[in-house]
């Protein structure tokens, strides 16, 4: 009886493992299908006609406040970003109701201590300053609403048409995911509530600086949270496609090189991304070679066992 139970367990455990793996894979696919631009994201992706000056419905009210939040360590913005910052100020003047707020390290610490002291142990535990900047932007926009944008993003035209289209807007990135270098929201938006309350769960070191930053509080963290949010009943959210967010003629924005926090590991990941076809080809060859060697070892062992078994049978027949 015990032997039969052991056999059933030996057969059942792998089967259960496969079933659980399939269920986990389906759940992950169901969440991450929103990562890739396509049919899943079409219903809430903004088009050029959505943001044309003459497409606003009569009486359509702006949902998102006319406040632009930006972050830097102090009041002295580097010269390399002066053109982008000034372009946004020109397109969004005070007389049109726009307000600019530059959040320095000192202002961020004061704001966080005063309003979100419960998060400060996690905030102080981040090993890299960029993680603190990433987390702070979520809290600031959750608290005040408005538009967050990095200093290396310039403005080619006013963002006014975007403010009435949804309660939250996030740009998609190619080939997959969403960016956290620009996003817009109403105050106390439920998606940002979800994001800030999940930061502590993702506060881990993921080998090197680049994946740690991206997964703990950066774009991959926000992308995953956004995909999860889309699976639940939610307020109107919209995605800003590359057509309206990239460097093209119809875009609201221009982009210059930023990412001052990138290290050597980031350069490796970026190189892999830019040479993805070659990397996949050589990875396939390596996987095939490893599989071939493993099969060769297995067949050799089986052959040796077969020869040994034959010899033992012969010895039993002819002692």
Curated annotation (Swiss-Prot):
Function of the molecule: With imt2 and imt3, is required for the synthesis of mannosyl phosphorylinositol ceramide (MIPC). Catalyzes the addition of mannosyl to phosphorylinositol ceramide (IPC). MIPC is essential for cell morphology, cell-surface distribution of ergosterol, localization for plasma-membrane transporters, and lipid-raft-mediated endocytosis of plasma membrane proteins to the vacuole.
A GO BP annotation: mannosyl-inositol phosphorylceramide biosynthetic process
Membrane topology annotation: Multi-pass membrane protein
Database matches in InterPro entries: Glycosyltransferase_domain, GlycoTrfase_DXD_sugar-bd_CS, Nucleotide-diphossugar_trans
Transmembrane segments: 8-28, 211-231, 279-299
An example Gene Ontology molecular-function term: inositol phosphorylceramide mannosyltransferase activity
Domain of life (superkingdom): Eukaryota
Organism annotation: Schizosaccharomyces pombe (strain 972 / ATCC 24843) (Fission yeast)
Name this polypeptide is given: Inositol phosphoceramide mannosyltransferase 1
């Amino acid at each position: 009886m015990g032997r039969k139970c052991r056999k059933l367990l030996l057969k059942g455990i792998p089967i259960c493992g496969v079933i659980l793996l399939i269920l986990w894979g389906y759940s992950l696919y169901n969440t991450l299908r929103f990562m890739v631009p396509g049919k899943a994201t079409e219903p809430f992706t903004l088009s050029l006609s959505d943001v044309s000056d003459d497409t606003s419905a009569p009486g359509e009210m702006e949902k998102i406040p006319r406040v632009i939040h930006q972050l830097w360590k102090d009041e002295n913005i580097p010269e390399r970003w002066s053109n982008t910052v000034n372009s946004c100020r020109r397109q969004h003047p005070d007389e049109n109701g726009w307000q600019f707020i530059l959040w320095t390290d000192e202002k961020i610490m004061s704001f966080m201590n005063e309003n979100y002291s419960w998060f400060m142990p996690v905030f102080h535990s981040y090993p890299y300053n960029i993680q603190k900047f990433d987390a702070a932007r979520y809290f600031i926009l959750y608290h005040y609403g408005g538009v967050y944008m990095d200093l290396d993003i310039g403005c080619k035209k006013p963002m006014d048409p975007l403010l009435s289209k949804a309660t939250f807007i996030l740009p998609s990135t190619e080939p997959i995911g969403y960016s956290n270098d620009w996003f817009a929201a109403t105050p106390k938006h439920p998606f940002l509530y979800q994001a800030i309350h999940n930061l502590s769960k993702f506060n881990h070191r993921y080998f090197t600086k680049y994946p740690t930053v991206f997964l703990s509080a950066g774009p991959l963290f926000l992308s995953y949270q956004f995909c999860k949010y889309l699976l639940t009943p939610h307020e109107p959210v919209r995605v800003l496609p590359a057509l309206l967010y990239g460097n093209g003629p119809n875009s609201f924005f221009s982009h210059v090189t930023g990412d001052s926090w990138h290290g050597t590991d980031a350069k490796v990941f970026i190189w892999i991304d830019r040479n993805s076809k070659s990397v996949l080809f050589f990875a396939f060859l390596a996987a095939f070679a490893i599989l071939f060697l493993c099969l060769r070892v297995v067949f050799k062992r089986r052959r040796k066992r077969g020869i040994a078994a034959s010899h033992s049978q012969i010895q039993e027949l002819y002692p």
